[in-house]
From Swiss-Prot:
Its EC number is 2.5.1.83. All-trans-hexaprenyl diphosphate binds at residues 84, 88, 93, 170-171, 208. Dimer of heterodimer or heterotetramer composed of a small (Hexs-a) and large (Hexs-B) subunit. Keywords: Magnesium, Menaquinone biosynthesis, Metal-binding, Transferase. Catalyzes the condensation of three molecules of isopentenyl diphosphate with farnesyl diphosphate (FPP) to yield (all-E)-hexaprenyl diphosphate (HexPP; C30), the precursor of the prenyl side chain of menaquinone-6. Large subunit Hexs-B catalyzes the condensation reaction and the final product chain length is cooperatively regulated by both the Hexs-A and Hexs-B subunits using the whole size of the hydrophobic cleft as a ruler. Its cofactor is Mg(2+). It comes from Micrococcus luteus (Micrococcus lysodeikticus). The lineage of its organism: Bacteria, Bacillati, Actinomycetota, Actinomycetes, Micrococcales. Mg(2+) 1 binds at residues 84, 88. This is Hexaprenyl-diphosphate synthase large subunit ((2E,6E)-farnesyl-diphosphate specific). It catalyses: 3 isopentenyl diphosphate + (2E,6E)-farnesyl diphosphate = all-trans-hexaprenyl diphosphate + 3 diphosphate. Isopentenyl diphosphate binds at residues 45, 48, 77, 94. GO terms for molecular function: hexaprenyl-diphosphate synthase ((2E,6E)-farnesyl-diphosphate specific) activity; magnesium ion binding; transferase activity, transferring alkyl or aryl (other than methyl) groups.
Length: 325
């Protein structure tokens, strides 16, 4: 008998998540309906719902609570994307126009708020105070991450610690919460809950570092946004930090000087120069950092009891660390 892949196993549950996402974004406001449908219909990998479901399936669980949790965390993620695109003035998201471009900035802000409110409303019936403490803290961290990102724009130098804090709040915290809340919903034992939570954190960190690498190495058709979007929006990420450090070791301070004087109105040639230097000097150390977190994630996964669900998590782990988009 051929074993199911994680996608085949999760497919009926992801279909249910998708159905409930569309139910959750219905409102009395035609404008919000259209804007929320715009972001939802642009697709997405549904990474967070997958981790909620698989973490919950490590033990017997109430599937309705798991679905609710998966839907709500995806709504939080969607809200953060809408707000991020507005803050960065990014025109594109997954190959489609961003909400603030397709509609307007006020609509984007209100749509993000609406999605957060729906996320909270959707899990209100879950009777577990620890669950709600974790969920609300996660939303706070995501909000702090948006403030971090605004504060760090065109603000070189950025410390390594500040970068790690930012990507934790931007990405890893939601994946960690997906694993943690899934385990909590299934009443998984304390030790296994710790390891699946840490797995979520580490793979989330690795995932975002890869995202930062791809921003320099991929192409617009694959990314659904222009190459070098991060630096064009003033975001100093690890590939650039590593490139600057490597060049300084060779007594070459030109890249650092360029980044220090970078503004939102800098010429396109300046950005092209930065991208070329990062490709040459910053990608390998960033890949090493991503693998470091990937190895930590693999360790925590190895501490879980053997099962088909663990195999699915290992499959996702391998795929996420080899992704090209």
């Amino acid at each position: 008998m051929i074993a199911l892949s994680y996608k085949a196993f999760l497919n009926p549950y992801i279909i249910e998540v998708e159905k409930r996402l569309y139910e959750c974004i219905q409102s009395d406001s035609e404008t919000i309906n259209k804007a929320a449908h715009h972001i939802l219909s642009s697709g997405g990998k549904r990474v967070r719902p997958m981790f909620v479901l698989l973490s919950g399936f490590l033990n017997d669980t109430q599937k309705d609570d798991l679905i609710r949790t998966a839907v709500s965390l995806e709504l939080v993620h969607m809200a953060s994307l809408v707000h991020d695109d507005y803050i960065d003035n990014s025109d594109m998201r997954r190959g489609n126009t961003s909400v603030h471009i397709a509609f307007d900035k006020d609509t984007a802000i209100r749509t993000g708020h609406f999605l957060l409110a729906r996320a909270l409303q959707n899990i209100a019936t879950i009777n577990n105070s620890k669950f709600h403490q974790i969920f609300s803290k996660t939303i706070l961290e995501v909000c702090f991450g948006e403030f971090d990102q605004m504060a760090d724009r065109f603000n070189y130098p950025v410390s390594f610690t500040a970068y790690l804090r930012r990507i934790n709040r931007k990405t890893a915290i939601l994946i960690e919460a997906s694993c943690h809340l899934g385990a909590l919903s299934s009443q998984l034992d304390e030790q296994s809950t710790y390891h699946i939570k840490q797995f979520g954190h580490c793979i989330g960190m690795s995932y975002q570092i890869i995202d930062d690498i791809l921003d320099y190495t991929s192409d617009e058709a694959t990314l659904g946004k222009p190459v070098g979007s991060d630096i064009r929006n003033g975001h100093i990420t690890y590939p650039l930090m590593a490139a600057i450090a490597n060049l300084k070791e060779q007594d070459d301070d030109k890249l650092e000087a360029v980044v220090k004087h970078l503004t939102s109105t800098s010429d396109d040639e300046v950005y092209q120069y930065i991208v070329s230097q990062v490709k040459q000097y910053g990608i390998e150390p960033a890949e090493l950092l991503s693998r470091k977190y990937g190895d930590k994630a693999k360790y925590h996964l190895s501490q879980l009891q053997d099962s088909n669900i663990k195999d699915y998590l290992e499959e996702i782990h391998e795929k996420m660390l080899k992704r090209v988009y």
